[in-house]
């Protein structure tokens, strides 16, 4: 076996061990955004950019009560939508993207959120992260690995990727993790990033992944 293949096999084994440990640590881990329909999940995920899921969940009840579906959001009052989502940050751009995405859903997809990655990526404000979340949690379709700030940070610290670009990170992780666990991996990594492996002061001394983590061993 070549050194490259041995390295890949070693990374795969570590990724498997990491996920097994995280599943035990966070047995109830799931998407933490509140939603009732695919379009509501799409909107909530757009709002979650540069914002916590907790904050998004405080905003969406009033937003979805006023604008419950794609048609209502697409042709609703822009200023009112901006006011309702103001606390999530970047509210003008988010309102523009939400309305643009919902308008396209209404006009080109018969009011239904598309279930194909290529089609989702044509919606304003939707990149692979948002598309992966919607496909996995609204439709049970595993098209890739969701890469948010936690997944990016922890995957690098754990030595699973050297890439900095989210698309390259996703490709690296897809090679290491079996497809049925693609979204499981992201969700559990996100939980661990929030609880233990923070950006500025990771709690390496308390981390149950420390023995598998090059960054913890180097610190």
UniProtKB/Swiss-Prot annotation:
Enzyme Commission designation: 4.2.99.18
Q: Which domain of life is it from?
A: Bacteria
Query: Sorted alphabetically, which keywords does the UniProt record give?
Result: 4Fe-4S, DNA damage, DNA repair, DNA-binding, Glycosidase, Hydrolase, Iron, Iron-sulfur, Lyase, Metal-binding
Q: Under the GO molecular function aspect, what terms does this record hold? A: 4 iron, 4 sulfur cluster binding; class I DNA-(apurinic or apyrimidinic site) endonuclease activity; DNA binding; DNA N-glycosylase activity; metal ion binding
**InterPro entries attached to this UniProt entry:** DNA_glycosylase (IPR011257), Endonuclease-III-like_CS2 (IPR004036), Endonuclease3_FeS-loop_motif (IPR003651), Endouclease-III_FeS-bd_BS (IPR004035), HhH-GPD_domain (IPR003265), HhH_base_excis_C (IPR023170), HhH_motif (IPR000445), Nth (IPR005759)
Cofactor comment text? Binds 1 [4Fe-4S] cluster.
Listed binding positions for [4Fe-4S] cluster are 197, 204, 207, 213
Q: Which reaction does it catalyse?
A: 2'-deoxyribonucleotide-(2'-deoxyribose 5'-phosphate)-2'-deoxyribonucleotide-DNA = a 3'-end 2'-deoxyribonucleotide-(2,3-dehydro-2,3-deoxyribose 5'-phosphate)-DNA + a 5'-end 5'-phospho-2'-deoxyribonucleoside-DNA + H(+)
Q: Which GO terms describe its biological process?
A: base-excision repair, AP site formation
Biological role: DNA repair enzyme that has both DNA N-glycosylase activity and AP-lyase activity. The DNA N-glycosylase activity releases various damaged pyrimidines from DNA by cleaving the N-glycosidic bond, leaving an AP (apurinic/apyrimidinic) site. The AP-lyase activity cleaves the phosphodiester bond 3' to the AP site by a beta-elimination, leaving a 3'-terminal unsaturated sugar and a product with a terminal 5'-phosphate.
Q: Its family? A: Belongs to the Nth/MutY family.
Q: What protein am I looking at? A: Endonuclease III
